Amino acid sequence: MPRSLKKGPFIDLHLLKKIEVAAEKNDRKPVKTWSRRSMILPQMVGLTIAVHNGRLHVPVLVNEDMVGHKLGEFAGTRTYRGHVADKKAKR
């Protein structure tokens, strides 16, 4: 269920401050964050944000199509290695 429009987008304040500082300095280093629940705002376009996936920080280059989505959508948390082949079925 989407968030109510009257509430506005959610973004953690510490992440918003980091984004503003990085935008002022035109810093190319990734902004490291653990806030997967924060929504991508237009101010973030062009920045690289390192989103934590539970094990490491995944660099996400934000473009215009990502605005309105959550940061966690672009850093998967589960590793899929494929189904193990059944040796009897192959014979």
UniProtKB/Swiss-Prot annotation:
SUPFAM superfamilies for this protein: Ribosomal protein S19
GO CC, one annotated term: small ribosomal subunit
Gene Ontology molecular function terms on file: rRNA binding; structural constituent of ribosome
GO process terms (BP): ribosomal small subunit assembly; translation
PROSITE patterns: RIBOSOMAL_S19
Domain of life: Bacteria
Keywords: Ribonucleoprotein, Ribosomal protein, RNA-binding, rRNA-binding
NCBIfam families, per the entry: rpsS_bact
HAMAP family (UniProt xref): Ribosomal_uS19
Entry's family note: Belongs to the universal ribosomal protein uS19 family.
Name this polypeptide is given: Small ribosomal subunit protein uS19
Native source species: Pseudomonas fluorescens (strain SBW25)
Top-level taxonomy: Bacteria, Pseudomonadati, Pseudomonadota, Gammaproteobacteria, Pseudomonadales
Gene behind the chain: rpsS
